[in-house]
């Protein structure tokens, strides 16, 4: 996606702030359902980070797999939990929480001071040119799309129906 510089920066700041707010929601919200939906926001923001870098297939795969499947399973699992047994001995702040926050804060500040000083332009990511890699990725994505929509269409749809039936069966068994 060819965006002008300021719009690209604003988009990245918006996605980054959504990612940070969603991560804080996962950690700080006490209601498990709200925490699971915050995790969904985090996963959506992560998948949207791939769109400005022209990785549309990876963004769509992230949305389908993580948001569409994993997060839905987490929400179902949270809905079937008995919430009263988890809130009986709830302490607001423990020694382990303080130690963990100290370690995470020190790692955050070390990353904040290290990343701007690192010269990223001298790092050789690959030995091949970027054009060849982009052509390979484009052809691979096109090949995957062609095979999924022609050769493997019926098995792909059958597997999705089998997974849907298994999920509904698991929910029905958990209800009883």
UniProtKB/Swiss-Prot annotation:
Belongs to the complex I subunit 6 family. GO terms for cellular component: chloroplast thylakoid membrane. Coiled coil: none annotated. NDH is composed of at least 16 different subunits, 5 of which are encoded in the nucleus. It is a multi-pass membrane protein. This is NAD(P)H-quinone oxidoreductase subunit 6, chloroplastic. Its main location: plastid. It catalyses: a plastoquinone + NADH + (n+1) H(+)(in) = a plastoquinol + NAD(+) + n H(+)(out); a plastoquinone + NADPH + (n+1) H(+)(in) = a plastoquinol + NADP(+) + n H(+)(out). The chain crosses the membrane at residues 10-30, 32-52, 61-81, 92-112, 152-172. NDH shuttles electrons from NAD(P)H:plastoquinone, via FMN and iron-sulfur (Fe-S) centers, to quinones in the photosynthetic chain and possibly in a chloroplast respiratory chain. The immediate electron acceptor for the enzyme in this species is believed to be plastoquinone. Couples the redox reaction to proton translocation, and thus conserves the redox energy in a proton gradient. The gene is ndhG. One of its GO terms (molecular function) is NADH dehydrogenase (ubiquinone) activity. It is found in: Plastid, Chloroplast thylakoid membrane. Pfam families: Oxidored_q3. Its EC number is 7.1.1.-. It is an enzyme of class 7 (translocase). Keywords: Chloroplast, Membrane, NAD, NADP, Plastid, Plastoquinone, Quinone, Thylakoid, Translocase, Transmembrane, Transmembrane helix, Transport.
